[in-house]
Amino acid sequence: MVDTEMPFWPTNFGISSVDLSMMDDHSHSFDIKPFTTVDFSSISAPHYEDIPFTRADPMVADYKYDLKLQEYQSAIKVEPASPPYYSEKAQLYNRPHEEPSNSLMAIECRVCGDKASGFHYGVHACEGCKGFFRRTIRLKLIYDRCDLNCRIHKKSRNKCQYCRFQKCLAVGMSHNAIRFGRMPQAEKEKLLAEISSDIDQLNPESADLRALAKHLYDSYIKSFPLTKAKARAILTGKTTDKSPFVIYDMNSLMMGEDKIKFKHITPLQEQSKEVAIRIFQGCQFRSVEAVQEITEYAKNIPGFINLDLNDQVTLLKYGVHEIIYTMLASLMNKDGVLISEGQGFMTREFLKSLRKPFGDFMEPKFEFAVKFNALELDDSDLAIFIAVIILSGDRPGLLNVKPIEDIQDNLLQALELQLKLNHPESSQLFAKVLQKMTDLRQIVTEHVQLLHVIKKTETDMSLHPLLQEIYKDLY
């Protein structure tokens, strides 16, 4: 059940002013005035059991760090880069509630026009032309010259082998191109753009869905500073910026204070509080920032601000953490997670080494991230996916479900077609992505259960007031 009085969550969803005196007073009614500033410094930090830390000699520490870093450096470059930024040309949609036409949606073989089975030897090609080109190259076949410039199509492709091979070369097939594997994004966008005008002419509704996808992506870029594309560039070493500082133990954490601009973790030399608790508190403050970012994004989803105000609150209350963990996956690989806007990389093993229950918090997120990242969604996919999460009509306590479901239905159509076009080789991707929504709910449920444990065991530690309000009556 959703509480109707929410003293910490602004109804205009600015979520930007935090006043400690207001937060400590639970007697007042919900203020509908917009918050204008964020002042996290007004929230006093609780006192924890002090644990002494000592600074090692800087030169010795740097030497030891460099040696140890060699063991962890490869962790930052272990995954292929995510597909590049969104291109409007690649966002093509068909008519709602209608299976895409094979003649339009299936990418054609560049040689004969048959349905392409994949990206082979540098171009999209059917199985027949792929095999023909492979045999010709491998056996070094030489065909009788033909000067007729025969037209190569599905029914005639076997009639003139010379012209067929010349067509293979003309469209860009190359034996060396096999090493590149999947289709380059630029080539994919070019091919999709070739059928864009035909689709829009036959299905005017698709233009609306394309506009929706573009709008959501633009809002996504404005709302979330560290996108997946930027994060993957850092993790794969494909950025001109310096590599993130790797934190793998207590000593490297202390060294990191001199190299990373921590926004929410008090430096060890100033506060000797237990590391696990301070890291947990830092995660809380980052979560509060993420709630603000998600809220701003939600306000830009067409139709969201027209919903009942209480339903807007409910949708965000139940959706924000599912989105936080979706976005967190973009910052993760199997070995660790980017922190402080990509300045640092904290290893998975270090986080697991924190004392219980804090050491248990991140492991389910890593397990989810590894599987979710395997789907290879890009930022244009994620922009629609998180909108679908927000507009979930089955959240407890909703007052008017119908308009919410109508908006989500439109978003689901956009997502399904987006995935079919952006990932033509993954026919079951839409179903797999929807399954992740169920997984995310389970992760949030487990997270809330761990918070209950902390509430009982860490009696002198409190949650951020905004997060308290979100977690109230949540699962």
Swiss-Prot record:
The Swiss-Prot or TrEMBL note on domains reads:
The 9aaTAD motif is a transactivation domain present in a large number of yeast and animal transcription factors.
Q: Which family does it belong to?
A: Belongs to the nuclear hormone receptor family. NR1 subfamily.
Q: How is it modified after translation?
A: O-GlcNAcylation at Thr-54 reduces transcriptional activity in adipocytes.
Self-association and partners: Interacts with FOXO1 (acetylated form). Heterodimer with other nuclear receptors, such as RXRA. The heterodimer with the retinoic acid receptor RXRA is called adipocyte-specific transcription factor ARF6. Interacts with NCOA6 coactivator, leading to a strong increase in transcription of target genes. Interacts with coactivator PPARBP, leading to a mild increase in transcription of target genes. Interacts with NOCA7 in a ligand-inducible manner. Interacts with NCOA1 and NCOA2 LXXLL motifs. Interacts with ASXL1, ASXL2, DNTTIP2, FAM120B, MAP2K1/MEK1, NR0B2, PDPK1, PRDM16, PRMT2 and TGFB1I1.
Q: Where in the cell is it found?
A: Nucleus; Cytoplasm
Q: Which PANTHER family match?
A: NUCLEAR HORMONE RECEPTOR, PEROXISOME PROLIFERATOR-ACTIVATED RECEPTOR GAMMA
Give the DNA-binding residues.
106-180
Entry-listed glycosylation sites: 54
Q: How is its activity regulated?
A: PDPK1 activates its transcriptional activity independently of its kinase activity. Interacts with HELZ2 and THRAP3; the interaction enhances the transcriptional activity of PPARG.
- To which species is this protein native? Cricetulus griseus
Spell out which residues are annotated as carrying Phosphoserine. 82
CDD domains from the xrefs?
A: NR_DBD_Ppar, NR_LBD_PPAR
Ranked from the top, the taxonomy reads: Eukaryota, Metazoa, Chordata, Craniata, Vertebrata
Q: Where are the zinc fingers (NR C4-type)?
A: 109-129, 146-168
Establish whether keyword Disulfide bond is in the entry. Answer: no
Motif 9aaTAD extends across 465-473
Instruction: Give positions of region: Interaction with FAM120B.
Output: 175-250
GO terms for cellular component: cytoplasm; nucleus
Query: What function does the entry list?
Result: Nuclear receptor that binds peroxisome proliferators such as hypolipidemic drugs and fatty acids. Once activated by a ligand, the nuclear receptor binds to DNA specific PPAR response elements (PPRE) and modulates the transcription of its target genes, such as acyl-CoA oxidase. It therefore controls the peroxisomal beta-oxidation pathway of fatty acids. Key regulator of adipocyte differentiation and glucose homeostasis. ARF6 acts as a key regulator of the tissue-specific adipocyte P2 (aP2) enhancer.
Q: Which GO terms describe its molecular function?
A: chromatin binding; DNA-binding transcription factor activity; DNA-binding transcription repressor activity, RNA polymerase II-specific; E-box binding; nuclear receptor activity; transcription cis-regulatory region binding; zinc ion binding
Q: In the record, which residues are listed under signal peptide?
A: none
**Chain positions of cross-link Glycyl lysine isopeptide (Lys-Gly) (interchain with G-Cter in ubiquitin):** 222
Name of the featured protein? Peroxisome proliferator-activated receptor gamma
The UniProt keyword set, sorted, is: Activator, Biological rhythms, Cytoplasm, DNA-binding, Glycoprotein, Isopeptide bond, Metal-binding, Nucleus, Phosphoprotein, Receptor, Transcription, Transcription regulation, Ubl conjugation, Zinc, Zinc-finger
This protein's major location comes to: nucleus
What does the record list as GO biological process?
Answer: cell differentiation; cellular response to insulin stimulus; fatty acid metabolic process; negative regulation of cholesterol storage; negative regulation of inflammatory response; peroxisome proliferator activated receptor signaling pathway; positive regulation of DNA-templated transcription; positive regulation of fat cell differentiation
Question: Per the database record, which ranges form the NR LBD domain?
Answer: 208-473
